[in-house]
């Protein structure tokens, strides 16, 4: 059995899980998510626990088993607690601000870059150099954060760009200089 797939998913109070053919609906205090499930996987909802069972030990079924369990667990955590990613903006004159729901970034271009949040995603700017991307869908939060980071990736030679909070700053050494 898949080590991850066989773990039961605890369902917190206030969260309901419904199983339908080909999908699992998860509802909670923060919202509702629908997870597509392979028809070969069997999802069982017991009191306070969700289990995923696979039909055989084929390689394909083993990989689907762990994937399905993780996607459902992410949905359960998302509707109960939510997900967020924090980005740091470093550089002279680099900053962010909210314009309505949209995020406006001034990151060294001749124009400000405006990022509209997709449905289910919110931006927070606690400081001009910090941006928090929040939502209930882990994949969407990560993708939006990656898209923002891609606007001005961290520079390898200068400590400027958009970083994930906690991301190590890897700087290359500059030119060694001429030897005399």
Swiss-Prot record:
GO MF annotations in UniProt: rRNA binding; structural constituent of ribosome
Keywords carried by this UniProt record: Ribonucleoprotein, Ribosomal protein, RNA-binding, rRNA-binding
Keyword Ribosomal protein belongs to the record: yes
Gene3D superfamilies listed in its UniProt record: Ribosomal protein L6, alpha-beta domain (3.90.930.12)
Domain of life from the UniProt record: Bacteria
A GO CC term assigned to this protein in UniProt: cytosolic large ribosomal subunit
Pfam families cross-referenced by the UniProt entry: Ribosomal_L6
GO biological process, one term: cytoplasmic translation
NCBIfam families cross-referenced by the UniProt entry: L6_bact (TIGR03654)
Family: Belongs to the universal ribosomal protein uL6 family.
Subunit structure: Part of the 50S ribosomal subunit.
Role: This protein binds to the 23S rRNA, and is important in its secondary structure. It is located near the subunit interface in the base of the L7/L12 stalk, and near the tRNA binding site of the peptidyltransferase center.
Protein name, per record: Large ribosomal subunit protein uL6
Organism in which the protein naturally occurs: Thermus thermophilus (strain ATCC BAA-163 / DSM 7039 / HB27)
Chain's gene name: rplF
């Amino acid at each position: 059995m898949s080590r991850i797939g066989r773990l039961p998913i605890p369902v917190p109070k206030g969260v309901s899980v419904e199983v339908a053919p080909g999908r699992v609906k998860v509802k909670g205090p923060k919202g509702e998510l629908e997870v597509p499930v392979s028809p070969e996987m069997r999802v069982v909802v017991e009191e306070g626990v969700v289990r995923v069972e696979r039909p055989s030990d084929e390689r394909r079924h083993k990989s689907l088993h762990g994937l399905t369990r993780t996607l459902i667990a992410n949905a359960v955590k998302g509707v109960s607690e939510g997900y967020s990613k924090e980005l740091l903006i470093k550089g002279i004159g680099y900053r962010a601000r909210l314009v309505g729901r949209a995020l406006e970034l001034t990151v060294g271009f001749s124009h400000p870059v405006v990022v509209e949040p997709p449905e289910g995603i919110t931006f927070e700017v606690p400081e001009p150099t910090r941006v928090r991307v929040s939502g209930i869908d882990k994949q969407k939060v990560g993708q939006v954060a990656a898209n923002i980071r891609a606007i001005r990736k961290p520079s390898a030679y200068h400590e400027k760009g958009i970083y994930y909070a906690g991301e190590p700053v890897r700087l290359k050494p500059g030119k060694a200089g001429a030897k005399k």
